[in-house]
């Protein structure tokens, strides 16, 4: 049985509207990209700063998730979405 990892990933983007559009449900969406490896995401943004964004991700396989982020598809998605990669932070759920 695979243990699901819950992660909070937050980052700044150049244009929150562009980032949000990439996450709209439908063909080619970021939801579809992550669903290929079984990841489900929920989207968030700061109501006073739409360029401060994030996702909560349910990740069944962290190695596959990291591979996707580093793949050509993942890097292209970040570039197209205007993600400021240097601002990206990820917290994973743990039990102390």
Cite the ranges covered by each PLM segment:
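Short S/T/G/P-rich N-terminal loop/turn motif that feeds into the first structured element of a domain
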Residues: 1-77, 81-96
């Amino acid at each position: 049985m695979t243990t699901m990892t819950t992660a909070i990933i937050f980052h700044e983007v150049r244009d929150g509207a562009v980032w949000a559009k990439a996450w709209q449900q439908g063909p080619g969406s970021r939801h579809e990209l992550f669903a290929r490896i079984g990841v489900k995401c929920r989207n968030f943004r700061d109501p006073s700063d739409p360029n401060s964004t994030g996702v909560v991700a349910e990740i069944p396989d962290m190695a596959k998730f990291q591979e996707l982020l580093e793949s050509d598809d993942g890097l292209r998605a970040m570039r197209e979405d205007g993600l400021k990669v240097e601002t990206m932070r990820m917290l994973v759920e743990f039990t102390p």
